[in-house]
């Protein structure tokens, strides 16, 4: 197995490991929303990692990975959100010739996935980076074009299970929320040092919280806040009682907003999807699973642009060379079936979208022409 670092990360020695536990929504993707809404999460209890929509991901990506050889030889799959490696393990097991590049910013996730995928040897390359570091990761691993991309967005249950990471509002822990434990900014930094107007903006834009200004005012008045428990208590005071009785846990939107801000999740996604589309070879495929509307909106917008014709509107026929570069493999966003949700409650809120690249024009040229 090859262990790589991004250009901004020092190379790391081999990772000693422990066993995994992983993956994870309702309609606002707070770290614990998926599991709490499904009644599937208890603080401090490690949960079995059941990869979300695993069979559907295999069904969608395998044709691209077996175009050259039925065993996957010559194909490269990038798992841009490696986590504990559940999806990656299935693809490597099914396709004994496949090479997989796994990306994750969380060193603990890479430790867990590294041990899990160690039996596959040099067919696996792991890179510590955010998923918007795709270009650098491919350069480091010597890969020019990719056969398939898989994105499973959001926070993993592995991160939720580690109470000290501060992602869950169901247990008292330090206000951390960093996906990369070496990153400088924490949720405590945001609530304790940001201006009231900036906290309001974060809660409104990233949490779609209608009481954003009210909550920000309470935060500034009461800070410093150092634990998730202190923040939850404040939110119960800040949000009017009638609103607390509807729409799920009153903390979910604030926790979602802080987590997104701390980890620059949406900016990273906006850069990652176009980079992935540009790196796909003709016949390659991309699958993205999103768990809340902010993520899905970005994916939907990028996919719509990728599947649009460049023929000027009003012409009755498609101009040669102006055909869409990608075709959709799903009709809109697919949801988990009742059977899947019963087997894996965490899949209830997922929205899956997939594309196939059918033309060889550079994606960057298409985007510049918009």
UniProtKB/Swiss-Prot annotation:
Residues 332-345, 353-370 have a biased composition (Basic and acidic residues). It is found in: Cytoplasm. GO terms for cellular component: cytoplasm. The lineage of its organism: Bacteria, Bacillati, Actinomycetota, Actinomycetes, Mycobacteriales. InterPro entries: RsmH (IPR002903), SAM-dep_MeTrfase_MraW_recog (IPR023397), SAM-dependent_MTases_sf (IPR029063). It comes from Mycobacterium sp. (strain KMS). It is an enzyme of class 2 (transferase). This is Ribosomal RNA small subunit methyltransferase H. SUPFAM superfamilies: Putative methyltransferase TM0872, insert domain, S-adenosyl-L-methionine-dependent methyltransferases. It holds the Pfam family Methyltransf_5. It comes from the Bacteria. GO terms for molecular function: rRNA (cytosine-N4-)-methyltransferase activity. Belongs to the methyltransferase superfamily. RsmH family.
